[in-house]
Curated annotation (Swiss-Prot):
NCBIfam families attached to this UniProt entry: S21p
A GO-annotated cellular component: ribosome
GO terms of biological process kind: translation
Organism: Gemmatimonas aurantiaca (strain DSM 14586 / JCM 11422 / NBRC 100505 / T-27)
Name of the featured protein: Small ribosomal subunit protein bS21
Amino acid sequence: MSEVIIHEDENFERALKRFKKKCEKAGILSDLRKHRHYEKPSERRKRKMNAAVRKNRRTRHG
């Protein structure tokens, strides 16, 4: 669980920005999106294979 302590001279928007940054770094939101629905093992393999193909294309052309 990400936790942010708000300092006396810090405003709420700044603390919220730090909290969002910590959550993003910890991978909480991406993990939540990934586990929102059940994914069959065959679908998971297909998704990973497509991601590898895209990554391979990017490295060859870029």
